[in-house]
């Protein structure tokens, strides 16, 4: 008991030290006027998918995303461990308006949202309400949502979320339960919809009333780079670049490329400061070379201009 108490005390002490000595995100400063200009003609970050052809496969896109999307607020534990717990500054709706189209949602059996053991002052019902309100206003967009069982429980997680998912069923991309093709949908298939990536104990897609909701997170039709546990910046950046190049050469798999990482001595904010601008410049270089389809780039603390430059890598009408 004393040992556990001592460990918790040391972690809290480290967090206080990091809180006072961690500097804000570095990098370039962008004016609001710069990032808020249309991407092309009248295309804005709120509706950027609307300017892409219906036939475009999701695997052929460059999609900005966020890691631990809801970790911009939380309870007292979140506040005390903020340097390690915080991964975002924008609210969910602000992220969607800024162009984020992949979100990382982690819930427990009580259907509240957590980052590990830390409650983020949010619920799954609130998340779904926010997403559907956005899709009502922007019906040609789609949101890819990883939904992780943060409790790693048994089948009860799927059982508990079914009534809530059923309320919003018209907003989810579904296929017949018997469909085993695992094909990546086109924009026409998913406009105005949520593509659910389920990460649960059963390791199977969510099924309600003989309809399959989205697909399993980590299924064979996906490639995931998520070296998050204390990599060097050099190693992490190399992995990001390699995964993006792989994505640009494949059109039958979703590439989930995490820019995020953390350790006890290097916080998510510090990794973001070291990596986000490097990744942005890399994307800009590939755009100028007409190398497209870089997959889903999943970030902590993304700047709005970084999000926009990832979007601009896509081939618009």
Curated annotation (Swiss-Prot):
Q: Name one GO biological process term.
A: lipid catabolic process
- Location(s) in or outside the cell: Secreted; Cytoplasm
Reactions this protein catalyses: a 1,2-diacyl-sn-glycero-3-phospho-(1D-myo-inositol) = 1D-myo-inositol 1,2-cyclic phosphate + a 1,2-diacyl-sn-glycerol
Q: What is its main location?
A: secreted
- Where does the PI-PLC X-box domain start and stop, copy by copy? 58-196
Q: Which GO terms describe its cellular component?
A: cytoplasm; extracellular region
Q: Does Cytoplasm appear among the keywords?
A: yes
Keywords, A to Z?
Cytoplasm, Lipid degradation, Lipid metabolism, Lyase, Secreted, Signal, Virulence
Gene3D superfamilies cross-referenced by the UniProt entry: Phosphatidylinositol (PI) phosphodiesterase
GO MF terms here are: phosphatidylinositol diacylglycerol-lyase activity; phosphoric diester hydrolase activity
| Signal peptide, first to last residue | 1-22
SMART domains, alphabetized:
PLCXc (SM00148)
Membrane-crossing residue ranges in chain numbering: none
InterPro entries referenced in this protein's UniProt entry, alphabetically: PI-PLC_domain, PLC-like_Pdiesterase_TIM-brl, PLipase_C_PInositol-sp_X_dom
Its Enzyme Commission number(s) read 4.6.1.13
Q: Which residues form the active site?
A: 67 (proton acceptor), 115 (proton donor)
The answer to whether keyword Secreted applies is: yes
Q: Name any one Pfam family assigned in the record.
A: PI-PLC-X
Role this protein plays: Cleaves glycosylphosphatidylinositol (GPI) and phosphatidylinositol (PI) anchors but not PI phosphates. Important factor in pathogenesis, PI-PLC activity is present only in virulent listeria species. It may participate in the lysis of the phagolysosomal membrane.
Give the multimer and partner information: Monomer.
Stated name of the protein? 1-phosphatidylinositol phosphodiesterase
Which species does this protein come from? Listeria monocytogenes serovar 1/2a (strain ATCC BAA-679 / EGD-e)
């Amino acid at each position: 008991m004393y040992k556990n108490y001592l460990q918790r005390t040391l972690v809290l002490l480290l967090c206080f030290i990091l809180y006072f000595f961690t500097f804000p995100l570095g990098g370039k400063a962008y004016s609001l006027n710069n990032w808020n200009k249309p991407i092309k003609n009248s295309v804005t970050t709120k509706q950027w998918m609307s300017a892409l052809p219906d036939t475009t496969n999701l695997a052929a896109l460059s999609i900005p995303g966020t890691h631990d999307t809801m970790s911009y607020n939380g309870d007292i534990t979140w506040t005390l461990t903020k340097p390690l717990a915080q991964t975002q500054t924008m609210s969910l709706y602000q992220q969607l308006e800024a162009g984020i189209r992949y979100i990382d949602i982690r819930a427990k059996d009580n259907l509240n949202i957590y980052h590990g053991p830390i409650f983020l002052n949010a619920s799954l019902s609130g998340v779904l309400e926010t997403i559907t309100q956005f899709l009502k206003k922007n019906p040609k967009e789609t949101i890819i949502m990883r939904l992780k069982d943060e409790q790693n429980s048994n089948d009860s997680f799927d059982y508990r979320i079914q009534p809530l998912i059923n309320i919003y069923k018209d907003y989810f991309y579904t296929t017949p339960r018997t469909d085993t093709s695992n094909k990546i949908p086109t924009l026409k298939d998913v406009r105005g919809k949520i593509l659910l990536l389920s990460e649960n104990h059963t390791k199977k897609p969510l099924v309600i009333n003989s309809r399959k909701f989205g697909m399993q997170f980590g299924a064979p039709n996906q490639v995931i780079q998520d070296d998050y546990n204390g990599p060097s910046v050099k190693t992490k950046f190399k992995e990001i670049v390699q995964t993006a190049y792989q994505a640009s050469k494949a059109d039958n798999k979703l590439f989930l490329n995490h820019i995020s990482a953390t350790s006890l001595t290097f916080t998510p904010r510090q990794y973001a400061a070291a990596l986000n601008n490097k990744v942005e410049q890399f994307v800009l270089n590939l755009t100028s070379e007409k190398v497209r389809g870089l997959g889903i780039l999943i970030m902590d603390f993304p700047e709005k201009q970084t999000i926009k430059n990832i979007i601009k890598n896509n081939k618009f009408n």
